[in-house]
Amino acid sequence: MAVPMDTISGPWGNNGGNFWSFRPVNKINQIVISYGGGGNNPIALTFSSTKADGSKDTITVGGGGPDSITGTEMVNIGTDEYLTGISGTFGIYLDNNVLRSITFTTNLKAHGPYGQKVGTPFSSANVVGNEIVGFLGRSGYYVDAIGTYNRHK
């Protein structure tokens, strides 16, 4: 049996911050969007997957800057649901070109948009039969770039 080949879409954004990558063994089942700056500014993303033993595999990107977290929103991805696409915008926030809004699309529905739809739009291809199995990008104080690891189901 052939091992599935993952492809990469993106990353979209800029070259600031440090590279990060999250490719869990099991599917991503929760995403937390953290806001800061006294408003609807997404400054951090947390991706989680549940391992076979029940423990969590988690990464948080962004959120290390001078802004304190003022709120969060949680996306729970159901057992019959899987990620198929992302879209959003990158724009200027405190003199940085960073993630300003994001929508997570699954085989069942769209979650979002989260944040403010300002700046330059981006979108991953929503290819039928593809599942997002991980994320990659760049981050420092904020999310500077984001892309996806995709696998044909």
Swiss-Prot record:
Record text on activity regulation: Hemagglutinating activity is most inhibited by methyl alpha-mannopyranoside. This activity is inhibited to a less extent (about a third of the inhibition of that of methyl alpha-mannopyranoside) by methyl alpha-glucoside, other alpha-glucosides, such as maltose, isomaltose, panose or palatinose, and alpha-glucosides modified at the second position, such as methyl 2-deoxy-alpha-arabinoglucopyranoside or methyl 2-acetamido-2-deoxy alpha-glucopyranoside.
Give its localization. Answer: Cytoplasm
Q: Which InterPro entries match?
A: Jacalin-like_lectin_dom, Jacalin-like_lectin_dom_plant, Jacalin-like_lectin_dom_sf
UniProt keywords (A-Z) are:
Acetylation, Cytoplasm, Lectin
Single GO term (MF):
cell adhesion molecule binding
Q: How is it modified after translation?
A: Not glycosylated.
Provide the biotechnology use note.
Can be used for the isolation of glycoproteins from humans, plants and fungi. Is a powerful T-cell mitogen in the mouse, and can thus be used as an alternative to concanavalin A for the mitogenic proliferation of murine lymphocytes. Identified as one of the several suitable fluorescently labeled lectins that can be used in a combination for the visualization and quantification of extracellular glycoconjugates in dental supragingival biofilms grown for 48 hours in situ in the absence of dietary carbohydrates. Used in lectin-based microarrays to detect altered glycosylation in cancer tissue.
Residues annotated with N-acetylalanine modification: A2
Asked if the Swiss-Prot or TrEMBL record annotates the protein with the keyword Mitochondrion, the reply is no
Which tissues does it occur in? Answer: Rhizome (at protein level). Detected in the cortex and the pith of rhizome. Not detected in vascular tissues, pericycle, endodermis or rhizodermis.
* Domain Jacalin-type lectin, residue spans: 6-152
Taken from the record, one Pfam family name reads Jacalin
Q: Which GO terms describe its biological process?
A: heterophilic cell-cell adhesion via plasma membrane cell adhesion molecules; positive regulation of mitotic nuclear division
Would you tell me the Gene Ontology cellular component terms?
A: cytoplasm
Subunit description: Homodimer.
Assigned protein family = Belongs to the jacalin lectin family.
UniProt function note: Mannose-binding lectin. Preferentially binds mannose at concentrations ranging between 5 and 25 mM, but also binds glucose. Has a marked preference for methylated sugar derivatives, such as alpha-MeMan and alpha-MeGlc, at concentration down to 5 mM. Binds to N-glycans, but not to glycolipid-type or other type of glycans. Binds N-linked high-mannose-type glycans. Has a preference for smaller (Man(2)-Man(6)) high-mannose-type glycans to larger (Man(7)-Man(9)) ones. Recognizes both alpha1-6 extended and alpha1-3 extended monoantennary glycans.
Name of the protein described by the UniProt record: Jacalin-related lectin Calsepa
Q: Which organism encodes this protein?
A: Calystegia sepium (Hedge bindweed)
